[in-house]
Amino acid sequence: MKIKLDLESDALYFRISEDTIEESEEISKGLVVDYDASGKVVGIEILNVKEKFKMEDLIGLKIEMPTIANVAA
């Protein structure tokens, strides 16, 4: 997973997979989901992040991911 905070375009993007984006859908105002050819989510974009989040919270963003052992269980 890759996370990109673009202050110039005021967007936060979570790239979950490197699969090709085939379709994008704004599922809620300012929330766009990217899908691959099979309909799986490959990315999530949050627009207008400066309005929705405190910048200090985004700068110190921490991601908790399960270990492979926990996912396989």
Region spans (language model):
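C-terminal structural segments of small proteins and small subunits
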Residues: 44-73
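A generic structural signal for short beta-strands and their flanking turns/coil linkers
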Residues: 1, 10-12, 29-31, 40-42, ...
